[in-house]
């Protein structure tokens, strides 16, 4: 039985095609003929659903949807270009129109430019550039590059003086606008002088190992610049060279008088006065005895206070002028039959005055304090210190 394919549009290409699931014939790599495409659009205009069009024409549903979608979007039923690149749509006429639109309204979007090209019939649905193409045209051809050089014809019009002035300004702005001299408004002559001084400083202060890195004095000169006067520089040197945290073991500098005026010294003065009053007045029988007026008594310096109050450090032996009380003075506080000899035999604490060993010196010399220690044992506070 012979099959006649006279009216079949695919009759000449049956050897390269196949049959889809709906029974229709297709050709690999080739678009649908324009006759089938036109019939798909006509059925869609009649209100036939895409699924029914697919069954009637035996064309796959995906192909029908793609053809109708392109038709609704662009109004064209032509297939895409097969092989090669798309025809050039950025013609000089289109580029000039895009440039005119952009100059008239710099904030116009690419899709607005595309719609205007279609409205003014500069392009049709097949030749209108896409949104991305319009953006690329604006970026590469419409907008002028910022680094364009001035044509040499402009320089020939200006006089020699103006050309020299423009060149000097451009050189200065390009070379020193972001430098320290440019920010501070220092003229070029001063900048050159400072640069020459820095270069001389580098040559005059080499490091002994052979490298020519700048030394300490050069770094100071470089950081100072011309911002400070000589008097201000001297004050800054004194401030930064002062040792704020003195070493309590290795420092041999005498403590200045103003460094001893701490708030801790004020609180220590009251305790020393109370202790001295209790030692010098044997008639004080109770804790609330009257304290006499202020007495002259040597204060412990801030260095000694820091060395004795820091935990974990060995105690600092006070100087000769700040020695502890003598043994007769301390033994006079306790009856001789109960406690004789040196009150404390521990060498670590025997060289300190009582203000460091007794937190409340007002209790010294009180009969109530020693009422429980009549058995000949030393006071509890001293025993506690001896165990340490």
Swiss-Prot record:
UniProt keyword annotation of DNA-binding present: yes
Biased composition (Polar residues): 143-158
Tissue and organ expression note: First detected in mid-neurula embryos in the folding neural tube. With the completion of neurulation, expression becomes localized to the midbrain/hindbrain boundary (MHB) till at least stage 40. Expression is absent from regions adjacent to the MHB. In tailbuds, weakly and transiently expressed in the developing otic vesicle from stage 21 to stage 27.
Stored Pfam families: PAX (PF00292), Pax2_C (PF12403)
Gene3D superfamilies xref list: Winged helix-like DNA-binding domain superfamily/Winged helix DNA-binding domain (1.10.10.10)
Molecular functions per Gene Ontology: DNA binding; DNA-binding transcription factor activity; DNA-binding transcription factor activity, RNA polymerase II-specific; RNA polymerase II cis-regulatory region sequence-specific DNA binding
Annotated keywords: Developmental protein, DNA-binding, Nucleus, Paired box, Transcription, Transcription regulation
Taxonomy, superkingdom: Eukaryota
Endpoints of the signal sequence: none
GO CC annotations, alphabetized: nucleus
KW DNA-binding (keyword) present: yes
Subcellular compartments: Nucleus
DNA-binding region: 15-141
Segments of this protein annotated with the region Disordered: 143-162, 191-217
PAI subdomain: annotated segments: 18-74
Region (RED subdomain) location: 93-141
CDD domains membership: PAX (cd00131)
Main location: nucleus
BP-aspect Gene Ontology terms: nervous system development; regulation of DNA-templated transcription; regulation of transcription by RNA polymerase II; sensory organ development
PANTHER family: PAIRED BOX PROTEIN PAX-5, PAIRED BOX PROTEIN PAX-6-RELATED-RELATED
Function: Probable transcription factor.
UniProt protein name: Paired box protein Pax-5
Species whose genome carries this gene: Xenopus laevis
Gene that this polypeptide is encoded by: pax5
């Amino acid at each position: 039985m012979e099959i006649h394919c006279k009216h079949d549009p695919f009759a000449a290409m049956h050897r390269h095609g196949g049959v889809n699931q709906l029974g229709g014939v297709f050709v690999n790599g080739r678009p649908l003929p324009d006759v089938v495409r036109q019939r798909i659009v006509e059925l869609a205009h009649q209100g036939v659903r895409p699924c029914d069009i697919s069954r009637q024409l035996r064309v796959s549903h995906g192909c029908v949807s793609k053809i109708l979608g392109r038709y609704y979007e662009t109004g064209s039923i032509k297939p895409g270009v097969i092989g090669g690149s798309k025809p050039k749509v950025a013609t000089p006429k289109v580029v000039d129109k895009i440039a005119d639109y952009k100059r008239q309204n710099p904030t116009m979007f690419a899709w607005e430019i595309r719609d205007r090209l279609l409205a003014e019939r500069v392009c049709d649905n097949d030749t209108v550039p896409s949104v991305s193409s319009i953006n690329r045209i604006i970026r590469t051809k419409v907008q002028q590059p910022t680094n364009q050089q001035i044509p040499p014809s402009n320089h020939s019009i200006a006089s020699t003086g103006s050309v020299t002035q423009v060149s000097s300004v451009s050189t200065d702005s390009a070379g020193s606008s972001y430098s320290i001299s440019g920010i501070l408004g220092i003229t070029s002559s001063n900048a050159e002088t400072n640069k020459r001084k820095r270069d001389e400083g580098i040559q005059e202060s080499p490091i002994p190992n052979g490298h020519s890195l700048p030394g300490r004095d050069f770094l100071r000169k470089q950081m100072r610049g011309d911002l400070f006067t000589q008097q201000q520089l001297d004050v800054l040197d004194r401030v930064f060279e002062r040792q704020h945290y003195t070493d309590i073991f290795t420092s041999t500098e005498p403590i200045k008088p103003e460094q001893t005026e701490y708030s801790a010294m004020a609180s220590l003065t009251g305790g020393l006065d109370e202790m001295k009053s209790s030692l010098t007045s044997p008639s004080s029988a109770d804790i609330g005895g009257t304290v006499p007026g202020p007495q002259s008594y040597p204060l412990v310096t801030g260095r000694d206070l820091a060395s004795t109050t820091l935990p974990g450090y060995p105690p600092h032996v006070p100087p000769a002028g700040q020695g502890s009380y003598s043994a007769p003075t301390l033994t006079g506080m306790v009856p001789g039959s109960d406690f004789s000899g040196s009150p404390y035999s521990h060498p670590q604490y025997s060289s300190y005055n009582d203000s460091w060993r007794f937190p409340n010196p007002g209790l010294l010399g009180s009969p109530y304090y020693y009422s429980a220690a009549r058995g000949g044992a030393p006071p509890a506070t001293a025993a506690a210190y001896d165990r340490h």
